[in-house]
UniProtKB/Swiss-Prot annotation:
Residues the entry annotates as binding Zn(2+): 77, 93, 100
Subunit record text: Homodimer.
Lineage, uppermost ranks: Archaea, Methanobacteriati, Methanobacteriota, Stenosarchaea group, Methanomicrobia
Protein name (database record): Phosphoribosyl-AMP cyclohydrolase
Record's keyword terms, sorted: Amino-acid biosynthesis, Cytoplasm, Histidine biosynthesis, Hydrolase, Magnesium, Metal-binding, Zinc
Protein's gene: hisI
Amino acid sequence: MPDLFPSLKYHDGLIPVIVQDAKTLQVLMFAFANEEAVSLTRSTGYAHYFSRSRNKLWKKGEESGHLQKIVRICVDCDEDCLLYLVEQTGCACHEGYASCFFRTMEGEVILPRLKDPADIYSR
């Protein structure tokens, strides 16, 4: 089976990554990865991303302990977006929710907060 890694299409050095829980298929988050982050994700088995706001590579859960163990990586038909299916430890969202998609466009919170963000990052 061919390895599509070399043919991935990055825009301004980044590729979008959608993250889903491997068991429930709940969408957990959306992030960007650069080539180094994708390579580290593949070699370590844990999700790595590139933060546009901090302009740096980061391993999900490095500070919080809320790691994302990779179960499978899928690439879309245009080879310009990735899907990480993960085993999530703790919360995916830095605001303490299981998913970053915890509210509607109207502002209604539709998921329970699992952790206080102050407790997550006070380690």
